[in-house]
Regions:
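Acidic-aromatic substrate-binding/catalytic surfaces of carbohydrate-active enzymes
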Residues: 29-115
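Beta-strand-rich recognition/accessory modules
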Residues: 33, 194-300, 557, 697-698
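Acidic, contiguous internal or C-terminal segments within carbohydrate-active enzymes
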Residues: 106-167
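Substrate-binding cleft of carbohydrate-active enzyme catalytic domains
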Residues: 301-455, 469, 476-484, 490
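Glycan-recognition surfaces
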Residues: 390-414, 418-422, 475-588
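Carbohydrate-binding surface patches
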Residues: 570-573, 578, 627-670, 701, ...
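C-terminal beta-strand-rich structural cap/linker in extracellular carbohydrate-active enzymes
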Residues: 690-714, 786
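C-terminal outer-membrane/trafficking sorting elements
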Residues: 719-805
């Protein structure tokens, strides 16, 4: 049962008076207990404290305390003001039922009025607790005249030290990069430094896996960040969770743009506590898709194919493209390098060097081979003449440039275009219509970060922030792309992580090539960002190269072990676009076609690895805090993924010497009796697991991939009851809100928890129901077989399957 305790309503009824307001300084603390959450407003501190509780109501963890939410705004006179709860004389606490993207629940609202600066404004903080989800949502608003402006709102703002975890070197803070440019990396810092993470972060203990996840679920107006100063491997000294980020890491020079009144709200912030922080990150991703579903328009399976930039680069040619496409169709496809739908992609990148007729012919011949042909486009970056006409308009490129401090602004050698400008949009429309007419159905979008720069102003009225401009431009682009019967696959390259819903895929890192250092860089992104494949249909490891062009990171003499490692990094990330020059008749000098074809025999024709890659999923780090060299920005070595039939475990070695070790089976979420055989997929050898650990030895610059075959009836393979014969479970699937689903569960015994998985074993939803016989689980749009695990109050587990058509 849900229990809400509002102490001030009882003890301060005289002071509160009509309307429920009371004067700060004369009140007791406000304490709200709702499910597993305890939200307190501490009067003496003029600040909030949020605790998570155990099932019995006892305290479990203080997530943050002395949080004096902070708003910076310009008043009607244009004067800059900063306010916190202590700035206001009065506070009113109310509650109301909510029914939004996250389900039904209660919104607890704190309204602060009569600021000491004399402005006619009020500050409002909401905490929303939901019946069907174990996270809470909070946001902060400043309200007043329509003339007010704000570019900084911090729903969580802590400036006094508190203990988050007991001191341990296993405690970590996750830094998520804003974009993937400049070889940015995910970091997992020990809790003895400062960092700023963008859009989301996690604090966790690597051994217990217990963790806190905080991040934004709205990405329409603001760039968001979480800044932390930590010490003593467990203490938080400063914590700011805010909308209004503007740093060199967001590619900005100007301060964040100001939003306009009369009501300005921060992004809604997800606050979650999880027994396993990795599950918490996945829950955060799914919470985002409740607000904005992913772009899942691609129905032709996991991308397997070729990409021209990895080796041919600027020396691409029509003849090489045709020869390579034929090689893929005639040799690689029959030998297993193809997805389960028989589809391959031929991706032509920048510097395609193709005439219009050659483009049309390449698409036609590819279609006859069952191949989808792709092209390259940079919608928001300009590399050409300033006086060039834009699309069908009379605007020149210069008319469309974004300006910073009055001057055209460039990143990486290209000038940034205003995504909202009609000239930019006409150019985008003209180019995309041309490509679609020529037959391209796969489009790589590069340098989209150029459209996410804070500028002096934007063409579109009402657009004042970089995030608004970016959304404006990409919503137009996807509208043009999706016109017609056959949508295009949109593959985002250099781009921000959020917003995510415009791309079918996104590169997990910057340019990534062939050698073991490139593999390590790719796996760094999966170590910290595997969960992003719940935002995108596919995570993209960039072009997979075996025999390079001879440039940095792309030597011609990589070892077979390095080839295996790089190929595997693609298989455990989500896409398989190999980029070698396989054209024997090409005389560009880039690559070595004969050697690449020889390597393809040993690497690309491994059907077990290709079958694993066809899952199109990113593998989860086994540990989450064991970087291979002890550095915060390094990759981990061990990754895993469960399906109904198999457990896959990939172990990388990024070093010059052999590595060996063992992984406890408990860390792989499998028991000794749950599987019958283990096969190492690169050697084909059967592996004997004697005790409670998987032992491994990996040669220098190489990888091992272990596949556990699950016994029938293990895990959630069969819809049968575990322990007890009397309990019964009935499941019904109904249409839900926002195109989603509602799973209605009727149980003959009181329920404690519901877990819903897809056929690959990925957790889609976990919901505590605490003693109910009936439960309704809201799901994002999904099709196929769903697997349900219902944990009863008495400890029994019931399993069921449900098909969604």
């Amino acid at each position: 049962m849900r229990n809400t305790l509002l102490k001030p309503i009882l003890s301060l009824s005289v002071l509160m008076g009509a309307g429920g307001y009371f004067t700060q300084g004369y009140a007791e603390d406000i304490v709200i207990v709702d499910g597993l959450w305890k939200i307190s407003y501490i009067e003496n501190d003029h600040a909030f404290r949020v605790n998570v509780l155990n099932e019995d109501g006892s305290a479990r963890k203080c997530l943050f305390t002395r949080s004096a939410s902070e708003a910076v705004y310009d008043n009607v006179a244009g004067e800059s003001r900063t306010v916190t709860p202590a700035s206001f004389a009065d506070i009113k606490q109310t509650e109301e039922k909510v029914n939004d993207e996250f389900g039904t629940g209660t919104s607890y609202t704190f309204t602060f009025t009569r600021p000491d600066n004399g402005d006619d404004v009020q500050m409002v903080q909401r905490f929303c607790v939901y019946e069907e989800n174990d996270f809470l949502i909070t946001d902060l608003s400043i309200e007043g005249d329509e003339a007010i402006r704000s570019n900084y709102l911090a729903p969580v703002s802590v400036s006094q030290m508190y203990v988050l975890f007991s001191e341990s070197e296993d405690n970590r803070m996750l830094k998520v990069p804003f974009d993937n440019d400049g070889w940015t990396r995910y970091n997992k810092y020990k809790m003895n430094t400062s960092m700023t993470s963008y859009e989301v972060t996690a604090w966790f203990n690597g051994e217990t896996k217990e963790g806190i996840v905080i991040g934004a679920v709205d990405h329409d107006h603001w760039k968001n960040a979480i800044s932390v100063e930590a010490s003593d491997n467990g203490r938080v000294n400063v914590l700011k969770v805010y909308s209004g980020a503007s740093t060199s890491e967001t590619r900005d020079v100007l301060p964040h743009g100001k939003l306009k009144g009369p009501k300005i709200s921060s992004a809604r912030m997800f606050v979650g506590f999880a027994d396993d922080w990795r599950t918490g990150m996945e829950t955060f991703a799914r919470a985002n898709t409740m607000v904005q579903p992913m772009r899942d328009t691609w129905d032709k399976g996991t991308p397997f194919g070729w990409q021209s930039w990895g080796v041919l680069e600027k020396k691409n040619s029509f003849d090489a493209d045709v020869e390579i496409a034929d090689y893929y169709h005639e040799v690689l496809k029959p030998n297993g390098f193809v997805n389960s739908q028989g589809m391959q992609i031929i991706g032509i990148d920048s510097w395609d060097n193709l005439s219009t007729d050659e483009r049309i012919k390449l698409c036609k011949e590819g279609g006859e081979n069952g191949q989808t042909v792709g092209l390259y486009f940079t919608p928001f970056s300009w590399w050409w003449g300033w006086s060039d006409k834009m699309g069908s308009t009379q605007y020149t490129a210069e008319d469309c440039f974004l300006k910073v401090n009055g001057e055209p602004y460039s990143l990486g050698g290209a000038i940034c275009l205003d995504p909202t400008h009609p000239g930019t949009k006409s150019w985008i429309s003209t180019r995309i219509q041309e490509m679609k007419k020529q037959g391209f159905r796969f489009l790589k979008l590069d340098f989209t970060s150029h459209g996410m720069v804070q500028a002096d102003s934007y063409y579109a009225k009402g657009v004042t922030t970089a995030m608004e401009a970016y959304n404006n431009g990409l919503s137009y682009l996807t509208k043009v792309v999706d016109e017609g019967d056959e949508p295009m696959f949109l593959s985002f390259s250099i781009s921000p992580l959020f917003p995510y819903h415009y791309g079918n895929s996104r590169r997990v890192g910057c340019d990534t090539w062939a050698d073991i250092g490139q593999t390590e860089y790719c796996m760094n992104a999966i170590s910290g960002g595997w969960w992003t494949d719940l935002l995108y249909q596919y995570n993209d490891p960039d072009h997979l190269v075996m025999v390079g062009s001879g440039g940095w990171g792309s030597p011609k003499n990589c070892t077979l072990g390095e080839n295996r490692a790089r190929f595997t990094s693609g298989a455990v990330t989500g896409m398989m676009m190999v980029a070698d020059n396989f054209a024997l008749n090409d005389d560009s000098g880039n690559g070595d076609a004969a050697l690449s074809r020889a390597r393809a025999q040993e690497i690309m024709m491994n059907k077990d690895i290709n079958e694993m890659a066809d899952l199109g999923r990113s593998f989860m780090p086994v540990y989450g805090h064991k970087e291979h060299n002890g550095n915060a920005d390094a990759a981990e070595t061990c990754f895993m993924h469960h399906t109904e039939e198999y457990l896959y475990v990939a172990v990388f070695n990024y070093t010059d010497g052999e590595s060996s070790g063992s992984i406890p089976l408990s860390g792989l979420d499998i028991a000794l009796g749950d599987f019958d055989t283990v096969k190492e997929l690169w050697s084909g050898e059967t592996v004997v697991v004697d005790g409670e650990e998987l032992s491994y030895k990996v040669p220098a610059k190489d990888v091992k991939v272990f596949r556990f075959h699950k016994k029938p009836g293990s895990g959630i393979a069969d819809a049968m009851s575990e322990g007890g014969k009397d309990a019964r479970l009935d499941v019904h699937i109904l249409p839900g809100s926002n195109g989603g689903l509602e799973m209605n569960i009727d149980s003959s015994a009181p329920l404690r928890k519901i877990d819903v998985f897809d056929l690959q074993g990925r957790l889609l939803k976990s919901q505590n129901v605490r003693g109910l016989y009936n439960a309704c689980v809201a799901l994002s749009p999904v099709k196929g077989l769903l697997l349900l695990r219902a944990c009863l109050q008495e400890g029994q587990v019931l399993l069921a399957k449900a098909m969604v058509h």
